[in-house]
Structures are given as structure tokens and as C-alpha cells.
Amino acid sequence: MNRFILLCTALLLAGSLRAQSQIGRNSVRLGVDLTSLDAPDAVGPRYVGRLARHFRQDRLLITAEAGYMRLAMANQPFNGIDPGVNRRTRLTADVTVLADLLPNPNHALRLGGGLSTWYRQDDIYMGATRVGLDNVAIDRRSRREVNTGWHLAAEYEWVFVPNWGIDARFRVANLSAAGISSMLGVGISHRF
Amino acid sequence: MAALLLGCQDLTLTDQSYQRVHVATFSVPIRSLMPGRETYPGSMTLRVNGTVDRPVVLSIYQLSGQTRYPVLTDSLPAGTHVNRSLRQDFYSRDEVELQVSGSPATIGSLEIDWYRQ
């Protein structure tokens, strides 16, 4: 009988210990953002990976994020000639500080901002003209550039089981010569 | 670090305008303009794809005021050309012109990419 009581006590303690286990202070997030680009207007998915360090009982986050985006958009033919697709590539790196406004362990509403460095590689159709009778000249612009700027971020996260959360977020980045990009995305994160 | 990043200028690695000219008729010489640019280039490049049954002459001129200076001239022999490339040192910001001349009886078509960088 004593052994049975001891076993039950041990099981209860084990459950209690598990319930009080600390949520990790780091997290990794994978997600996708629907991202708009500067003119000519284009929107497409940007795949994002993020590492975060959580401070002050999860109320403050410092994150480092990398993303990749590649678009190929067709253009209308000019006099029956295909002017070629617009090819646009982005490699993005962002550092963000986020503060949680909700004092709730399962829900987080975070606002923040930070610095962005984006690499862009564009090959874009600029226009076309007829030359002579049936001939066409197509003007294109090819550019590779590194743009720096800042961004603002808002995100909501629901921790649906300990250490796992899903989130939705909105971001705006101002990248000087590359214009303003807005992003609407979802993701899943794991704490460790 | 933040001040350093915010103070950064955009870093342009390459920025070039180029033109793709589709030529299907050779009844008159074809002339296509590329406007001047702000930064100095280092070279002029032509890349040709297509088939013609007679020789065709490709020329590039630098337009400086009322004067046309020849920059590059090449004669394409009859036949099929795949990524035939011509390159010439070129350092001017002036407007440039591509001229394609062939016999009016020439049959075929050419796709010519030309750019300065």
C-alpha cells in the first residue's frame, strides 16, 4: 500500500513538474509573407526564417530574420513580340525588436520595428517601340543593388501547445531607393 | 550599428539599360536609339541570335551633338547565329544608335541584345 501511495505521489509530482516546465527563451519561426514590391507593382510570396531571443517573461523579443523571394511576371506582347518576363529576386535580412502588449502566456500581440538590408536583382521590361515596318526595339533594365532602411511590425501569436505557436503578422519596410514594401504573412514557431 | 545602417547609402552593384531589337524585315536600314546615361560605361556589347540568308551589317554609333562617331561595326555572314557576341571598349555617356543594314531581299530574322556596362 505504501508503495502504491509512493508511486501515485511520484506520478503527481512528475505531472506537476512537467506542467511548470519553463517555456524556452529562444524560438525559431518559419513563415511566408505576401510581399509587395516597388514599381512596376508586383506581389508575391517571400519565404522567411527567423531566430528570436525572448526576454522579460516573453514580453520582449529581439529577432534576426532572413527571407527569399523570386518572381517572374509575364508582360503583354508588343506587336506580336514577347518582351520577356520581369524577373525579380530579393534576399532579405532584418533585425527587429518586438514588445508584447498582452500579459497572457498563450497569446501575444507584438509591436515593434527595426533595421532592414535587402538585396534586389531585377530585370524589368521598360517599354517598346516600333522600328521601321515590322521591327521592334524592347527596352529593359537590369539592376543589382543592396538597399538599407527600416521597418515597422505588428504580429499576433497563439501558443496552442507549450513551445509551439502560430502567428499572423503585418509589416511595412521603407528601403530608400527600393521604395516601400508591405508584407502580410503567417508562420509557425517553436521555442527551445 | 543602427546609425551605421541608417546612414548607409544604397549600394549599386550593376545598373544597366539594354535593348532587344527584333528585326524581321530588311527593306530599309533599321535604326534604334539608346538614350544617354548618368554614369560612365566601360564597354559596349552586342549579342545576336537568328538566321539570315544574306550578310547583314551591324553598326553602333555614338551621337554627340550633330556628329555620329562609329563605335563598332561588324558584318554578319549569312547563316544561323546563336549567341554571337561582339564587345568593344566604350566610355561615353552620350546617346548611342544601333543600325542594322542588309539587302532588301534578305530573308530571315534577328534578335539583337545590345547594352553598355
What residue spans do the PLM features occupy?
Chain B
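Edge beta-strands of jelly-roll/beta-sandwich modules across compartments, strongly enriched
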Residues: 53-58, 104-116
